[in-house]
Each structure stands twice: as structure tokens, then as C-alpha cells.
């Protein structure tokens, strides 16, 4: 039986969530309907589930969600990961910090040349800094929990997050493109 570890992006990233419907909560209902008919197991770490519940009001369907999706954390204290992963992470983080500083310096020079601080200059700094620092990098405990749980369960990680997919790939975790989840569920259900 296939196992899938879900990230919030399945339900919150507009490009992924639309596969289950236009309305976010109806989309979760559609996912649950498909999950019940699919010969697979679905998991979500507690930290990711808590984050998801802060993003979406699941009050009326929380019990249904927890019926179809196992909510559990990885066994962090008994798992090991290769030291090379940590070395690569530190190397990448150092490079990103340097890029972020260069962007901040560039915008500071532009601001110094301006007679007043334009709001679009601040917005540009914020966007470029975020891109340099976060895009393609695991940047939260929730992200790490999902990757570790997929590794522990030998499950497929379902996420649109580039950083999670990149780390999962480095660690040998099976990956499923989040945009394809509904079709994969339907394919599995049709064969059952």
C-alpha cells in the first residue's frame, strides 16, 4: 500500500489546491472523499496539521480529516540523517545570507540616492530578500517534520515547496508532485 505525507501546500497553494475545487473547504472535502476510496495511507505531521488548521477553519470537518489522514510526528530522537546533509545546508545558508546582505546593501544605496523612501523600494527589497533567503530552502520545523516523516515511513512526500522537495530528494525520499495528487488518487482508486 502506498503512503503519502502531506504538506499544507496541497491545500493552500493555489496551483495545487485547485485540483480539488475552487472553494478551499470544499476542496478539502473532495480530497477526503477521494482518500476514502483510495487504497493508500495519508499522513500529516502534527506541526503541519496545526499550521494547516491556522490557515483553514476545519472545525466542522476536523474529525473527518483525522479519520482519513493519520496525524503523527516523526520520531525525531531515534532518526539519523547523514552529516553531509547538514554540511550542505550550512553552506547553502551561508551563501543565502551573503546574497541577502548584498541585496540589502544595494537597496540602501538606492534609498540614499532617493530624496524620500518610496514604498515600492521597500517592497522590492522585501521581495528580493525573501527570494534570496527562502526560495528552495527548508525554513521551518513543519517542513523538516514532513520530510522526516516521509523518510521514516518510506512514504511519498507530497508538497509544492521547493525546499522540502530538494531536501527530500537529497535524503532519498520518494516525491510526488503535488499538482498530480488528485489524479494519482483517482488512478489508485480505479485499480482497486
From Swiss-Prot:
Q: Give the EC number(s) listed in the UniProt record.
A: 3.1.26.5
User: What are its GO biological-process terms?
Assistant: tRNA 5'-leader removal
Listed CDD domains: PIN_VapC-like
Instruction: Note whether Nuclease occurs among the keywords.
Output: yes
- A Gene Ontology molecular function term of the record: ribonuclease P activity
One Pfam family this sequence matches: PIN_5
Catalytic activity reads: Endonucleolytic cleavage of RNA, removing 5'-extranucleotides from tRNA precursor
Per its UniProt entry, what is the enzyme's top EC class, as one word? hydrolase
Task: Give UniProt keywords alphabetically.
Answer: Endonuclease, Hydrolase, Nuclease, tRNA processing
Q: Does the entry annotate any disulfide bonds, and if so which pairs?
A: none
Q: Which HAMAP family match?
A: RNA_free_RNase_P
- Which NCBIfam families does the protein's record reference? PRK04358.1-5 (NF003344), RNA_lig_partner (TIGR03875)
What family, per the record?
Answer: Belongs to the HARP family.
Tell me the function of this protein.
RNA-free RNase P that catalyzes the removal of the 5'-leader sequence from pre-tRNA to produce the mature 5'-terminus.
Its protein name is RNA-free ribonuclease P
Amino acid at each position: 500500500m502506498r503512503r503519502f505525507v502531506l504538506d499544507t501546500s496541497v491545500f493552500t497553494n493555489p496551483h495545487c489546491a485547485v485540483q480539488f475545487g475552487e472553494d478551499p473547504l470544499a476542496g478539502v472535502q473532495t480530497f477526503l472523499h477521494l482518500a476514502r476510496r483510495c487504497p493508500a495511507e495519508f499522513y500529516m505531521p502534527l506541526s503541519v496539521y496545526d499550521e494547516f488548521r491556522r490557515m483553514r477553519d476545519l472545525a466542522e470537518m476536523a474529525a473527518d480529516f483525522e479519520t482519513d489522514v493519520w496525524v503523527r510526528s516523526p520520531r525525531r530522537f531515534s532518526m539519523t540523517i547523514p552529516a553531509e546533509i547538514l554540511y550542505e545546508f550550512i553552506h547553502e545558508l551561508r551563501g543565502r545570507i551573503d546574497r541577502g546582505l548584498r541585496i540589502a546593501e544595494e537597496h540602501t544605496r538606492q534609498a540614499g540616492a532617493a530624496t524620500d523612501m518610496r514604498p515600492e523600494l521597500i517592497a522590492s527589497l522585501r521581495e528580493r530578500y525573501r527570494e534570496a533567503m527562502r526560495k528552495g530552502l527548508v525554513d521551518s520545523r513543519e517542513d523538516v517534520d514532513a520530510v522526516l516523516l516521509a523518510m521514516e515511513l518510506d512514504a511519498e512526500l507530497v508538497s509544492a515547496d521547493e525546499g522540502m522537495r530538494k531536501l527530500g530528494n537529497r535524503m532519498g525520499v520518494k516525491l510526488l508532485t503535488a499538482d498530480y495528487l488528485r489524479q494519482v488518487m483517482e488512478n489508485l482508486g480505479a485499480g482497486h
